[in-house]
Amino acid sequence: MATLGFNTRRIQTPSLPRIPKPSSFTKPIKTHHLFSSETLLKRCRFVSRSLPESSLSITKEQEVANEVEEDDPTSELSYLDPESDADSIKEWELDFCSRPILDSRGKKIWELVVCDASLSLQVTKYFPNNVINSITLKDAIVTITQDLGVPLPEKIRFFRSQMQTIITKACKELAIKAVPSKRCLSLFLWLQERYDTVYTRHPGFQKGSLPLLSLDNPFPMNLPENLFGEKWAFVQLPYSAVREEISDFDEKFVFGASLDLDLLGIEVDENTLIPGLSVATSRAKPLAAWMNGLEVCSIEADSSKGCLILSVGIATRYVYATYKKTPVTTDEAEAWESAKKTSGGLHFLAIQDDLDSDDCVGFWLLIDLPPPPV
């Protein structure tokens, strides 16, 4: 997994080396090809408080007061970008967990953090540890919609398996679909930013405190039969082609998922080759449809075990494919994984009818990000 130094401006990513020619792998892969198709915004902005409509004409005294409030790590946040369309925010990312901060009773403070993928919506609220339940969460979600004038979301993504019962129950009572997923990238980045600029400055901060609810990394299971392809290959695309592929993603693909590269601050040369995995099958459309419901997170080449690991949801890992370990195949797997790390974790999964085709039935742009420090 790549280690990224994130800031609110950009993540710097070095150039990606060329990947050696891929080899064939098994179950039920029989052949291999290099996928060579050439056809295959917002910058991160975190705010510390909501701005009143009269902010354009505030006095110097008010400016000083606002700066003090913005600098206060104990303050809460309720923000909606005034230029955004509130009705268009249909999916939220949510974390409800303890923080490395003690209250006056010496107990860990809990915090609700909510945003959307574009960070147009940003909300934080602290809670004592004796009110943590689905009712508290449900009421907090409703309060967000009332305070900011946004509708209830259709989906809420969350990444902590330990909170699944509470979050799912709260969402069910509000007719919201709870989606367990590590594709909460905006939330991941925001939590990292809050740790660096808010939590560590809080008067109750406990240095060295470990997360109460850590992320799961379970042993990989066998892949369900309906997710098998017939062939696969390590592949690579120029960064320019990746950007083109996701430029009008919703129009091109029924199946798949994109990333906001501007939000992530990815900076690489347009000719840099981004590693990926191409899977071909005569059942491309059904396979892509099945994959579409899995919240695909990442793919890992495990050269020590001679297999590829597919991570989906929040705590599910599959042995996606296996291969015969030889010096050549080991070098190829290690080169692919190294290239992925060098690109800041950026990689992709393409599902096709044929490995020689220039078209994809499904396309998932993926990235490895370290888990948040809280």
From Swiss-Prot:
GO annotation terms (biological process): chloroplast organization; de-etiolation; photosystem I assembly; translation
Induction record: Induced by salt stress.
Annotated segments matching region Disordered: 58-84
Gene: ATAB2
PANTHER family associated with the record: PROTEIN TAB2 HOMOLOG, CHLOROPLASTIC, PTHR34556
Loss of function: phenotype: Albino phenotype and seedling growth arrest at 2 to 4 leaves.
Top-level taxon: Eukaryota
GO annotation, cellular component aspect: chloroplast
Protein name in the entry: Protein TAB2 homolog, chloroplastic
Organism: Arabidopsis thaliana
